[in-house]
Amino acid sequence: MNSRRKFLKNLTAVGATVPLVSNIEAKPKKNKGPVILCSRGEMWGEKVLKPGWDILSNKGKLLDAIEISSNVTELDPEDTSVGYGGLPNEHGVVQLDASIMYGPTHNCGSVAALEGIKTPCSVARLVMERTDHIHIVGKGAQDFARAHGFKVENLLTENARKIWLRWKENLSSKDDWFPPSTEPYDEIRTTGTINVLGIDSESNVAGITTTRGLAYKIP
């Protein structure tokens, strides 16, 4: 009986606190948006973010803003990290991955091992907006892109080709895909990924990641 009484007493005490807890609601801070940011901003922040900021600051669409900012690096042939000009796989073929997420709908879309398309994040957005899929890969991703008007092109620039050839010439004699011991690992097997995040004036959040993955990866 004592244990039952103690249980009911404790239950009553807990119940009494419920209204107090429910009344302690976090008051939203005054919105400070819009905001747009990117990884490695110290290197290319102004160049990458300005197109997206121009859209957001004029009350344009959040997804348009982060996509156009991501496209800046994807379309830059001098940048070997992502998109056009990215370092290829071991066969000298550039394969790209990208993903996009949109806070208001909780939806996402992505592509992987996409060849011949300079702006994979734009294809990922179409996967999110025009299909019930989350992820499309390889030839299927390329076919999907072509069906939506994307042009298939050779993404291997002369600069990236020379870097790849230098890697091929210095492959391990054991054929084990590890870099030669005479050179630093990060100079041989670099990764290339960028991220762009945005918040609009309504505090909606969205983000894009675009990458060519590990340089000289096994396809």
Predicted regions and their residues:
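Hydrophobic h-region of N-terminal signal peptides that target proteins for export
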Residues: T17-S22
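Alpha/propeptide regions of enzymes that mature by internal proteolysis
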Residues: N2, L11-T12, A16, K27-P219
